[in-house]
């Protein structure tokens, strides 16, 4: 028997492993099984080189539990090891030193195991003792047994072993008894080893017999040694891809389409990415794409390997150029990983462009299911955006689809304003904004539908990329103001009449929570609506963008600001003003006369300010007295007009019709409108 100390530069590696890898200790099984698979693959390589003459068609890895002995054993029939190889690969562990080791990896637990060839030692995370029973493939080799109880000391001696290969026998620690449970081991094997390239056996197949499941004599192979991504795309059918999709994403609808990745230069990468029906569900989950290294599961947290927007997809990526054990920060900084990320982005964009050209109709039918993915990509990845500008679609209120360039050509002849700006009109709710859409259509304008979750930031992005272009929601102003074709029409209301109208209508707008209303005027055609409610494009968009950008919370807290726009050329509006003037003439005349006289006094006093330093001291009191008087007179005038308006059903009806058209008339105000409508019949 040989005794010795493990050649490490720290006095005891095992407390280090247990301390810093405790949170990830389940990966020991992946490491031990991966080593076993490597041993079988190396034997196959030797056979191909003519250095091994035996059979290689029965290579396998077995995992066995012995709850009575408290052991978990991983066995392979690979190359095995000689005493010298045990000494080299197990006993002599070299790395840079304890202090550097701890400082570098204490925050990156998963980066330790495997990074310095320590995969075997991960067994000590869950074991109080580990044995190696091994017999090398080399002719005349002796079977060896190596034993270590977690201290730097080990024993090595000859043993009896009939078959070539290695058994790793782990005596599970009392605190880690979960790794003696069949279901726990089965779950870990399914997670980490389900696609390993060599059969992995755990337990027996079962059959239903005498009212219960019983073991058969057939070994249960838990993995698929030739997963779909390792096969040539030309030999696969659609049903193969769909079947594999449901194997890795059970319970999901069939995918829309997929991309089979296959590249071997300047890096090696295979995989399959599936496009599910995303629709308006911006759920960026971190576990939909699984990352493998030579068919060994690494992680399903692929930030850094693929751009964020790609995490809306599902599937697998396999690359030996991504280290098996890495931290997230390592992934994000690795040069190969960055190249892989760029390649995947380019490949996905190319596939989408190909689909859009190959069958335009089919691509349009899928658009609403993938729209949010493409918009998210265009908003977050500039390179993807450049490619996507060629195939991204927009749709109008009639349900027609257009590529961005095609739509620009469609509208630039008719929707360019007098200043040369191309105006894109859009709606977010076809039913609620029907009257505004119709007003635009009546002018011969086309209106886009922008009702998706990311459409508002998408609109802002398109504005930035297209000079002399702007997007405006169709209800943000009257249509003639949205696309100005000529100078303003002449208003048929005087300034005094507009002032009267402003008070008449503003005084009767019902109070609506978190909303403010302003009265404005537009000289429209007599056949246009008499009263229209609009919402400023700028303020509304700022509030909407506040949902996406934390720095814009200020806008999100502001009340909704609406304009009650009166058509100064509409006969009903003019009739209301004429009736008010006629009815209030006797009451308003003395107030107006006194206000006019007071304003004259104010102007006379202000004219005494010759040098811009203010009125003379002896006139300041007179100025304030008259300004206060003017304020009182204006308030009295507004009170008279408001009192008149309160009894005028036409004013209220015009306001309520406009509110109703915007979905703003509710509760008591809606009930009053209905009663008034009946009484006016």
Give the positions of each predicted feature.
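GHKL (Bergerat-fold) ATPase N-terminal catalytic module, capturing the glycine-rich phosphate-binding loop
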Residues: 1-180, 187, 342, 589-599, ...
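GHKL/Bergerat-fold ATPase module in large chromosome/replication-associated machines
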Residues: 112, 130-153, 173-177, 183-681
């Amino acid at each position: 028997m040989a005794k010795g100390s493990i050649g490490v530069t720290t006095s005891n590696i095992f407390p280090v492993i247990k301390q810093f890898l405790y949170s990830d200790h389940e990966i020991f099984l992946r490491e031990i099984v991966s080593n076993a698979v490597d041993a079988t693959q190396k034997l196959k390589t030797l056979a191909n080189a003519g250095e091994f003459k035996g059979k290689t068609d029965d290579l396998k890895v077995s995992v066995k539990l012995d709850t009575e002995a408290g052991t978990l054993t991983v066995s392979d029939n690979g190359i095995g090891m000689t005493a010298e190889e045990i000494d080299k690969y197990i006993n002599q562990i070299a790395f840079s030193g304890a202090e550097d080791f701890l400082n570098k990896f204490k925050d990156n637990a998963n980066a330790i195991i495997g990074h310095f060839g320590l995969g075997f030692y991960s067994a000590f995370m869950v074991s109080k003792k580990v044995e190696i029973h091994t017999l090398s493939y080399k002719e005349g080799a002796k079977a060896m047994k190596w034993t270590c109880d977690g201290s730097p000391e080990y024993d090595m001696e000859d043993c009896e072993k009939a078959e070539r290969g290695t058994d790793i026998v782990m005596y599970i620690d009392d605190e880690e008894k979960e790794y003696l449970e069949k279901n726990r081991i089965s779950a870990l094997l399914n997670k980490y080893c389900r696609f390993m390239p060599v059969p992995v056996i755990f337990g027996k197949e079962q059959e239903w017999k005498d009212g219960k499941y019983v073991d058969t004599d057939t070994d249960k192979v838990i993995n698929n040694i030739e997963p779909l991504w390792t096969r040539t795309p030309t030999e696969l059918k659609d049903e193969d891809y769909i079947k594999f999709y449901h194997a890795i994403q059970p319970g999901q609808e069939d995918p829309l389409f997929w991309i089979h990745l296959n590249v071997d230069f300047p890096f090696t990468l295979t995989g399959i990415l599936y496009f599910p029906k995303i629709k308006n569900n911006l759920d960026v989950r971190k576990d939909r794409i699984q990352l493998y290294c030579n068919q060994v599961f690494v992680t399903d947290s692929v930030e850094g390997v693929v751009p964020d927007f790609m995490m809306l997809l599902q599937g697998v990526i396999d690359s030996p150029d991504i280290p098996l054990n890495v931290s997230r920060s390592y992934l994000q900084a690795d040069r190969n990983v960055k190249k892989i990320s760029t390649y995947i982005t380019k490949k996905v964009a190319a596939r989408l462009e190909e689909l859009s050209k190959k069958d335009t109709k089919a691509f349009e039918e899928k658009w609403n299911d993938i729209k949010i993915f493409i918009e998210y990509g265009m908003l977050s990845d500039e390179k993807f955006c450049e490619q996507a500008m060629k195939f991204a679609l927009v749709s109008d209120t009639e349900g027609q689809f257009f590529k961005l360039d095609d739509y620009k050509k469609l509208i630039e002849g008719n929707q360019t304003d007098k200043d040369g700006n191309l105006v894109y009109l859009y709606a977010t709710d076809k039913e609620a904004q029907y009257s505004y859409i119709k007003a635009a259509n009546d002018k011969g304008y086309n209106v886009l539908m922008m009702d998706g979750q990311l459409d508002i930031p998408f609109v802002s992005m398109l504005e930035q990329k297209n000079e002399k272009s702007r997007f405006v929601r169709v209800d943000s102003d009257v249509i003639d103001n949205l696309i100005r074709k000529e100078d303003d029409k002449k208003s048929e209301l005087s300034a005094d009449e507009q002032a009267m109208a402003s008070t008449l209508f503003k005084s009767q707008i019902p109070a609506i929570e978190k909303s403010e209303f302003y009265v404005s005027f537009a000289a429209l055609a007599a056949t246009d609506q008499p009263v229209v409610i609009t919402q400023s494009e700028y303020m509304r968009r700022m509030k909407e963008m506040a949902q996406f950008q934390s720095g814009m919370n200020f806008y999100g807290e502001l009340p909704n600001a609406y304009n009650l726009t009166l058509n100064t050329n509409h006969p009903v509006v003019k009739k209301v003003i004429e009736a008010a003037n006629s009815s209030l003439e006797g009451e308003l005349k003395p107030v107006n006369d006194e206000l006019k006289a007071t304003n004259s006094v104010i102007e006379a006093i202000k004219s005494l300010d010759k040098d811009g330093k203010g009125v003379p001291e002896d006139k300041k009191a007179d100025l304030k007295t008259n300004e206060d008087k003017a304020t009182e007179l204006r308030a009295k005038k507004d009170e008279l007009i408001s009192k008149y308006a309160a009894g005028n059903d036409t004013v209220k009806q015009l306001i309520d019709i406009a509110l109703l058209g915007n979905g703003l008339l509710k509760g008591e105000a809606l009930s009053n409108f209905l009663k008034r409508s009946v009484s006016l019949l």
